[in-house]
């Protein structure tokens, strides 16, 4: 009798079936128009913030990414949370002692928008080492959504990746690996303040192009060659090909810098800190081989 009552069901998240109608050109045009309405200011560090520095944003963004990864959040949660954070910082001066509270609140709201089972206030407070209380986070949530005028359905680079892949004549197994690497690049870009000036569609296109280049897929498929893929993606998002190439090079340079810092931290943590302070911005002449990246 005891064995008959044993429940062996696995709790799985229910997902909708893919809808090809959501990937047509009309939807893409609407998305390209909508992304302009949710763009943060590129100069808020100079014009709005008195205490917050780019290095502080980098620290809190890295912490937010680690929380999202540990909680296995949907890929869209972290970039959406960073969109909220940048837009809020574009409008309201924030004390540096409140930056982590703002970051936690942005994750809290973004997870409600994208997760089936969102992050709880109590869990996020634990990740701050209980430096904030749940009631503080809930109050900050009201401040955040009111400041953003409840415009919370912002476009993120992830929204565009599927549109690009659906239009590319590429084998499904290659699409899967391009998607995975592009999603990783998008998260990496969200931690770097230099990419605030790039619209989500360009970050997505640059990430897809960088993934295809780094995986050397162009040798087997002429469509994925450097110039041909860049021209194709620039037409899709209606931008100058040179601007897209510059964005792609920035992504490759950021990846190379991140890999170099990670390797140095394993060897000499002190030397890695010194190099991070220098903030070198050298563009990679050749794409980083992303096959060496453990994603």
UniProtKB/Swiss-Prot annotation:
Which residues does this entry mark as bearing Phosphothreonine? 286
Entry keyword Transcription: yes
Biased region (Acidic residues) positions are: 273-282
Covalent link (Glycyl lysine isopeptide (Lys-Gly) (interchain with G-Cter in ubiquitin)) residue numbers: 270
InterPro entries of this UniProt entry? Cyclin, Cyclin-like_dom, Cyclin-like_sf, Cyclin_C-dom, Cyclin_N, Cyclins_cyclin-box
Q: Which ranges carry the Cyclin N-terminal domain?
A: 28-152
Q: The organism sits in which domain of life?
A: Eukaryota
Offer one example of a GO biological process linked to this entry: response to UV-A
Residue ranges crossing the lipid bilayer per the database entry:
none
Q: Any one cellular component term from GO for this entry?
A: nuclear membrane
Q: Does the keyword Endoplasmic reticulum apply?
A: no
Question: Where does the record place the region Disordered?
Answer: 264-295
Any idea where this protein resides?
Nucleus; Cytoplasm; Nucleus membrane
GO MF: cyclin-dependent protein serine/threonine kinase regulator activity; protein serine/threonine kinase activator activity; transcription corepressor activity
Q: Which UniProt keywords apply?
A: Cell cycle, Cell division, Cyclin, Cytoplasm, Isopeptide bond, Membrane, Nucleus, Phosphoprotein, Repressor, Transcription, Transcription regulation, Ubl conjugation
The entry's comment on post-translational modification says: Phosphorylation at Thr-286 by MAP kinases is required for ubiquitination and degradation by the DCX(AMBRA1) complex. It also plays an essential role for recognition by the FBXO31 component of SCF (SKP1-cullin-F-box) protein ligase complex following DNA damage. Ubiquitinated at Lys-270 by the DCX(AMBRA1) complex during the transition from G1 to S cell phase, leading to its degradation: ubiquitination is dependent on Thr-286 phosphorylation. The DCX(AMBRA1) complex represents the major regulator of CCND1 stability during the G1/S transition. Also ubiquitinated by the SCF(FBXO4) and Cul7-RING(FBXW8) ubiquitin-protein ligase complexes. Following DNA damage it is ubiquitinated by the SCF(FBXO31) protein ligase complex. SCF(FBXO31) ubiquitination is dependent on Thr-286 phosphorylation.
Q: Which family does it belong to?
A: Belongs to the cyclin family. Cyclin D subfamily.
Summarize the protein's role.
Answer: Regulatory component of the cyclin D1-CDK4 (DC) complex that phosphorylates and inhibits members of the retinoblastoma (RB) protein family including RB1 and regulates the cell-cycle during G(1)/S transition. Phosphorylation of RB1 allows dissociation of the transcription factor E2F from the RB/E2F complex and the subsequent transcription of E2F target genes which are responsible for the progression through the G(1) phase. Hypophosphorylates RB1 in early G(1) phase. Cyclin D-CDK4 complexes are major integrators of various mitogenenic and antimitogenic signals.
Q: How does it assemble?
A: Interacts with either CDK4 or CDK6 protein kinase to form a serine/threonine kinase holoenzyme complex. The cyclin subunit imparts substrate specificity to the complex. Component of the ternary complex CCND1/CDK4/CDKN1B required for nuclear translocation and modulation of CDK4-mediated kinase activity. Interacts directly with CDKN1B. Can form similar complexes with either CDKN1A or CDKN2A. Interacts with UHRF2; the interaction ubiquitinates CCND1 and appears to occur independently of phosphorylation. Interacts with USP2.
The protein's name is G1/S-specific cyclin-D1
Origin species, per record, is Bos taurus
Gene that encodes the chain: CCND1
